[in-house]
Amino acid sequence: GLPTCGETCTLGKCNTPKCTCNWPICYKN
């Protein structure tokens, strides 16, 4: 989805569960 996860992603991975990387920001699905 659109809400951000409050983190940036490195190497295309996000630490927060159910979040995906749209560099440089992680978004909830």
From Swiss-Prot:
Disulfide bonds: 5-19, 9-21, 14-26
Cross-link (Cyclopeptide (Gly-Asn)): 1-29
Domain of life: Eukaryota
A GO BP annotation: killing of cells of another organism
Matches recorded under SUPFAM superfamilies: Cyclotides
Name of the protein described by the UniProt record: Cyclotide mech-3
Keyword line: Cytolysis, Disulfide bond, Knottin, Plant defense
Protein family membership: Belongs to the cyclotide family. Moebius subfamily.
Free-text note regarding domains: The presence of a 'disulfide through disulfide knot' structurally defines this protein as a knottin.
Cited InterPro entries: Cyclotide (IPR005535), Cyclotide_moebius_CS (IPR012324), Cyclotide_sf (IPR036146)
Reported function: Probably participates in a plant defense mechanism (Potential). Binds to and induces leakage in phospholipd membranes, particularly ones containing 1-palmitoyl-2-oleophosphatidylethanolamine (POPE). In vitro, displays cytotoxicity against cultured cells but no hemolytic activity towards fresh erythrocytes.
Statement: the UniProt record of this protein carries the keyword Metal-binding: no
Post-translational modification: This is a cyclic peptide. Contains 3 disulfide bonds.
Species: Melicytus chathamicus
